[in-house]
Amino acid sequence: MTPTAPPGIKPLLNTVRGHRQARPPIWIMRQAGRYLPEYRAVRAQVGSFLELCYTPKHAAEVTLQPLRRFDLDAAIVFSDILVIPDALGQTVGFETGEGPRLEPITPEGLGKLRPDNVVTHLAPVFETLERVKSALAPDKTLIGFCGSPWTVATYMIAGHGSPDQAAARLFALQQPEAFARLLDILVEASIDYLVAQFRAGADVVQLFESWALNLDEAQFAAYVIEPNRRIVAGVRAQIPDAPVIGFPRGAAGMLPAYAEAVGVNALGLDHGTPLAFANDALPPGLPVQGNLDPLRLAAGGRQMEERAEAIIAGFANRPHIFNLGHGIIPQTPVEHVARLVEIVKRGS
């Protein structure tokens, strides 16, 4: 059992570093978003979603909004996993009600990508981090993030989100050299992006591997584990001991291999991961994050409260960050979020 840490200035950061707290710190994936009326008001002031991401004044405002409403332990910078392909020069847009749309990448198009442009193009994100950092209370953790290479590649190849990632999986099998080159580009771009986020004030970063499902063990090792391992190592070569949360959604039985090989400080669990499996299969001192079903939060009521309490109890003997198993959905009533935070804050 990891000893309970003495009170620290940033409970969430302390937890990521392996210290149990008296109660789990909490943040919520997509906590700055459409379920908040104040977010919708800001969103209406800008022309496009990417414009919101690249306007530091507005991006900092929406980053801070959920912390004004709820006693959350962290802010996560408002951005998107697809800012990297945008920075690389791929055409990226967001259609209302349809999600992201990209010009699909081809093997021939890889040479047109501009890895050297990433940090310059994403300077507004770093300014947003600096603005948020200056406004945060000292006990709040600031989280940066990026999409992991496999997940970002699925969008770059298909041109949109895909529930089975078939286009990317087929591309990887039929064009292995081009796919390996694409992953290399994304690894290096991600390292540069995350290092710059740390230097702009991020306390911890999260790697979003949102599409880790639908891969066999060999593909998972090559497309998920190895690129994420390289990113963590590359970031720490410049920012020693940089704290990293990995979130390989849908990894299921391959979670232990990911945890062992990638080198993340904490492991995000989706809501399909049984608590007993996580406790039995993962190292006892490894911090975990999660894993309430977002639909339980949207539905609210006693079922949500009981499941939240079960998760807190289930991970009571290891460092635990309370979160959802995926992003909060827009239909979620703000009252349900307030009730969840209340339950977590009382520690049971």
Regions found by a protein language model. Name each.
Residues 97-135:
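A gly/proline- and charged-residue-enriched helix-loop-helix capping module
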Residues 1-87, 91-94, 131, 230, ...:
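N-terminal basic, low-complexity leaders that serve as flexible interaction/assembly modules and, when applicable
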Residues 52, 111-118, 171-174:
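A short acidic, glycine-rich active-site loop
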Residues 11, 48, 103-109, 116, ...:
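General structural signal for secondary-structure boundaries
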Residues 4-7, 26, 101, 241, ...:
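Generic low-complexity segments that are intrinsically disordered, proline-rich and/or Lys/Arg-biased
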Residues 123-348:
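Active-site loop segments of alpha/beta catalytic cores
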Residues 19-51, 81, 87-96, 103-106, ...:
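N-terminal small/glycine-rich loop or linker at the start of catalytic domains
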